[in-house]
Amino acid sequence: MNSLAPNAVLQFGQSWLDRFLPPRPQGRVFLVGGAYKCLLHGRPPRDLDLFCADVNSRREVLVSLRSHGARTIADNPPYQETLSLDGLSIEVAYDTTQSTLEARIDSTDIALSAIGCERGPAGDRVLVHPLAHVSAARREILLLTPLVNWKYALYTLERMHRYAEELGFVVPAEQEEYVWQLFLAQPAPERWSMIRRYKLVSAQSGPISERAMSLCAEVSA
């Protein structure tokens, strides 16, 4: 059985979107990202990542969430506003530049995050990147290269290891090495900027930032 088959992804997306959105809202919202790992490990999601096609769609989603009892627990512009609904964390991105599900999927860096369900006036539809199927079949965490969000590659590496731990998968050595080679290929000011960005978005910021700083020192020596 293919856990990431379109019908399974659609049923999963609908089961969660139905909790706070009508079947055919005026705007369009995309439930994209790591929540679909639940189809592989069988546990409920800890959080949902919502992206909207435009500002009006985002406003509609927030109004609908609050009408269902959601409350804001963190606001971190220009990245996301985080709401809590019945113990579930829901992150609503500020970025609305990707106006289609295809564009949103193309903006991800990890294959198992390149899965999404769109809800809009025309109903629901899903999209699963082909490499997500490969990742699941191999039980490996794979990158979508070249990385679109390469400036946040260190955080992507952290997420890769978190995904692997949650799923019992592995991070192939060549995938991890790709990130470090990308990091080392940058000029020194950009390498330090990548470290600063990582520390801003990471809740851990331990071994990865330490290795990054060590590599910077080695290159400078």
Model-identified regions with their sequence ranges:
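Catalytic cores of the polymerase beta-like nucleotidyltransferase superfamily
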Residues: 1-221
